[in-house]
Amino acid sequence: MSIKFTTLLAVLFALLAYARAQAERRHKLTRPVHRFAPNRPYLAGKRIVGGFVINISDAPYQISLQYDDDHNCGGSILSSKWILTAAHCINDNAPSKPTVRVGSSKHASGGTVIRVARIVPHPMHGSKNNYDIALLELKNELTFSEKVQPIALPEQDEPIEEGTMGIVSGWGLTLSEADSNDVLRATNVPTVNQQECNKAYQSRYGGITDQMFCAGYKQGGQDTCRQDSGGPFVAKGKLIGVISWGHECALAGYPGVYARVASVRDWIRTTSGV
């Protein structure tokens, strides 16, 4: 009798362990992928897929956000003292504050490296990717040049028309051995219908919010990817989006998801004066 009872307990424990493992596996498969890849145990980021090489003078507002001299995310220059990036790019457990490299087409050399003095994530940012925005105050002011320039911002709640073409840029994963991410790359993608994007992400991630918008092609092929996070989506000369997350990279039916800058314009102005 005791042997049968022991055997039954062993079977029950085995079934519970299997169920737990399957649940953890499903959780891993359905988590949204931030556009930012791990170079350190405490870091995570993404890169441009299906794009082309550009010079920093073509996107002089682009910066590389770095921890321990390693590129981890992108960002955009708002003024001589302020940078806009994604809140999920900020790591509170890092041993030191990050730095930014400006004015260089390469994330590992050239330009100027400046330490971040203060990090201000949006107060509404949480675990569900909403309000994925953070401001970085620099220790020293930038000197503007052909390669270092601020980008204009939209007004609060300024609408984005469906099909608006924007340019995204960064040093993220290219998914191609032939395309190096050592130099700055970019691609052009159109914004997509908000309801259609929400439907695409509903079953896996619970959809998107009004503080987000999506951009990409139905067939996939062009997108941002790991270590592009925090970088710019620029349309008509304005920074309308911050690279945030998505399901894998450049997959058909899953456009990239961006934090909507117009939804936090007043907060940016109040916090930075820009």
UniProtKB/Swiss-Prot annotation:
Residues 48-273 form the Peptidase S1 domain. The active site is at H88 (charge relay system), D132 (charge relay system), S229 (charge relay system). SMART domains: Tryp_SPc. GO terms for biological process: digestion; proteolysis. Residues 22-47 form a propeptide. It holds the Pfam family Trypsin. Keywords: Cleavage on pair of basic residues, Digestion, Disulfide bond, Hydrolase, Protease, Secreted, Serine protease, Signal, Zymogen. Expressed in the midgut. Expression levels drop a few hours after blood feeding and pick up again 28 hours later. SUPFAM superfamilies: Trypsin-like serine proteases. InterPro entries: Peptidase_S1, Peptidase_S1_PA, Peptidase_S1_PA_chymotrypsin, Peptidase_S1A, Trypsin_dom, TRYPSIN_HIS. Disulfide bonds join C73-C89, C197-C214, C225-C249. One of its GO terms (cellular component) is extracellular region. It is an enzyme of class 3 (hydrolase). Its EC number is 3.4.21.4. Residues 1-21 form the signal peptide. GO terms for molecular function: serine-type endopeptidase activity. It catalyses: Preferential cleavage: Arg-|-Xaa, Lys-|-Xaa. It is found in: Secreted. Constitutive trypsin that is expressed 2 days after emergence, coinciding with host seeking behavior of the female. This is Trypsin-5.
